[in-house]
């Protein structure tokens, strides 16, 4: 249960938890009002906050906000709105935006236009939340780089739209994470940390000391979220979470 995850993370020492809006824990369509309240109680009882939420963009229904099918786009936007409502229930300030993907037979120009329209609608629905655009180069093909994020932010141009990035995706592109931090500056609202193969920070090649310094330089005020440990089946989640926490605490 999600409540048990919250208890374990709080016991390790985490300040917050990022909740993915996916089955079995937090898929909006499967959550009763009692289940939502139970998670709220677990957060309060354990002194931990919901830092952010991420819709489940792949698998199942798909939820491609850049789909050529207007019905699929509408369903995807509706899903984001449901997750925005969950953010409000659980006090999460940030909703991540995965910009979808350009499918075979459609142009990049059209896919970009559709994701822009979707982002605009979501941002208008949730002016009280930060909508953080994530470049997902290893998983999709539309918002692939820091330049893409900046272009989409500038185009939609809403005050509650910001940026985020994942160190794993910068590795995939052979880029330097600190370049993203300095380029995005005050527009950087959230960050995912992971090392090679989704290992915990400190286990691979990412220079986290420089990342922390860069975040200080730009006066970053958001959370450091771990997106780790799902690269293989024989993973012990508590061990991954503890190693990530202890390493980051040692360099902050």
Functional labels for PLM-detected ranges:
Residues 13-16, 91, 100, 162, ...:
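Glycine-centered flexibility sites
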Residues 3-4, 42-46, 60-162, 172:
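Active-site acidic/histidine proton-transfer and metal-coordination neighborhood
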Residues 20-22, 55-58, 100-102, 134-138, ...:
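Active-site beta-loop-alpha junctions enriched in small/polar residues
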Residues 17-19, 50-55, 95-97, 131-133, ...:
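Hydrophobic faces of well-ordered beta-strands that scaffold small-molecule active sites
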Residues 1-92, 120, 158, 186, ...:
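N-terminal pre-domain/capping segments
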Residues 6, 30, 66-71, 106, ...:
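Gly/Pro-rich active-site loop or hairpin
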């Amino acid at each position: 249960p999600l409540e048990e995850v919250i208890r374990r993370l709080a016991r390790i020492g985490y300040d917050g938890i990022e909740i993915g809006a996916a089955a079995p824990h937090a898929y909006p369509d499967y959550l009763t009002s009692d289940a939502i309240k139970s998670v709220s109680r677990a957060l309060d009882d354990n002194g931990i906050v919901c830092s952010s939420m991420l819709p489940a963009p792949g698998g199942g229904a798909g939820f491609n906000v850049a789909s050529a099918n207007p019905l699929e786009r509408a369903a995807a936007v509706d899903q984001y709105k449901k997750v925005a409502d969950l953010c409000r229930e659980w006090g999460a300030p940030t909703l991540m935006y995965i910009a979808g993907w350009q499918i075979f037979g459609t142009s990049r120009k059209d896919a970009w236009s559709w994701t822009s329209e979707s982002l605009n609608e979501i941002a208008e629905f949730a002016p009280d939340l930060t909508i953080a655009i994530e470049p997902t180069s290893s998983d999709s093909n539309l918002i692939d780089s820091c330049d893409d994020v900046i272009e989409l932010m500038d185009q939609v141009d809403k005050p509650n739209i910001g940026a985020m990035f994942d160190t794993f995706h910068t590795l995939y592109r052979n880029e330097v994470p600190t370049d993203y931090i300095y380029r995005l500056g005050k527009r950087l609202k959230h960050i995912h940390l992971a090392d090679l193969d989704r290992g915990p920070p400190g286990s691979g090649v990412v220079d986290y000391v420089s990342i922390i310094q860069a975040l200080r330089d730009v006066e970053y005020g958001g959370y450091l979220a771990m997106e780790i440990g799902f690269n293989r089946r024989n993973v012990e989640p508590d061990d991954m979470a503890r190693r990530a926490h202890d390493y980051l605490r040692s360099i902050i």
